[in-house]
Amino acid sequence: MNSTPMHLLRLLLFLAMLPLAACNDPRSNSLSRLRHADAAGLRAEVAQLTVKLLPPAGPELVPIQPELWPVGLLKLRPLRLNLYRDGLAVSLQAAPGFEYGLHIVAAGADAQLKSTERTRYEKLQDGIYYFTQKR
């Protein structure tokens, strides 16, 4: 009996499933969204949000309401945006006990993010980091 058609069918099925598997990986998902965005524009929007919403002597964290989300950041399809002194956390995916996304440093700022016990950062490009955070 010839098994070549069965191997071909399995190969085709495997290739068809690859994009779906990548969508479930939070890092791949975040990178895909970033590839379709203007990184410099995102950093400029974060700088504007920082000036507008984060006073120098105010809180360390400002959750940003959806009606205030800039157009460029909306294109990332975020779950939530939290503005910190070192940039904007753009949560893109959540799972039980974890949150994943991009941390964008404001244009003109040179913050170097360091991982902590709760949050792990990976630099993707100047001013943009991938993060995994325990909730």
Where are these regions (language model features)?
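Sec-dependent bacterial lipoprotein signal peptides
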Residues: M1-A21
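Intrinsic disorder/low-complexity signature
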Residues: T4, A21-A22, R35, L83
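N-terminal export/targeting and maturation segments
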Residues: C23-P78
